[in-house]
Amino acid sequence: MKIGIIGGTGPAGSGLALRLNVAGYDVVIGSRDKARSIEKVKELQALWPTHNLTITGGDNGDAVNCDLVVVATPWDSTATIVGEFASQLAGKIVVTMANALVKVGKEFQPLVPPRGSIAAHVQAEIPLSKVVAALQHLPAKELGNLNHHVDSDVLICSDHPEAIETVSDIVERIPGCRPLNTGRLSNALALEAFTAVMLQMNVRYKTRVAPRMTGLPDIDPISGRNLKI
């Protein structure tokens, strides 16, 4: 499977590209400026020379032509950018990892978009795509450090069960990550808003927190997925 990352030159996008490529996926980093994405790939390859990275740099058009697409742009441009590629994204799984947040004084606070979440707005812009909300809570700095062991549950929601399964399979290949199905896309409001809580804890406790749910069975009774980690 080839995975494209729109806006993949930022910390979250490039960190995710690293993890996915090391996990065995072909990855294309997209950007409005193709030269910038090519430079980012060279930077990653120089930083991690022993991992034989095969990430490709391209523009956002190259990213949307992949089998599955992740949108890693700032939240206020996510829906607009995917809307530009609505026809190319038709029928594809599109993962949004955006959070609508604002900093008020020293605190992060969630913003509630008119449609309830960034993910819902994206689904409205590309109605023929299978939009999935996921990856909002993975710390970008840790993702981009291959010497750091990621230790996090990844909460996933979508109106398309088969898309949740596909994204879960991908997440499961990142060591330390456990995918959890959190239901329909309407729950993206809660996933996105919870990021503000996590960031506030980071500030207060001078650390980087990640979600880890307890009380789950070893096996998901619906999908049969092994929930052990």
Regions found by a protein language model. Give the residues of each.
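Active-site-lining helix/loop region of Rossmann-like oxidoreductase modules
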Residues: 152-229
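NAD(P)+-binding Rossmann beta1-loop-alpha1 motif at the extreme N-terminus of oxidoreductases
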Residues: 1-43
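Rossmann-like NAD(P)-binding element
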Residues: 48-93, 100-106
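Short beta-strand and adjoining strand-loop segment in the mid-core
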Residues: 107-115, 145-162
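A short helix-to-beta-strand connector/capping loop
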Residues: 47-56, 127-130, 177
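Conserved Rossmann-fold NAD(P)-dependent oxidoreductase catalytic core, especially the SDR/UDP-sugar
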Residues: 94, 98-116, 133
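Rossmann-fold dehydrogenase core element
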Residues: 114-135
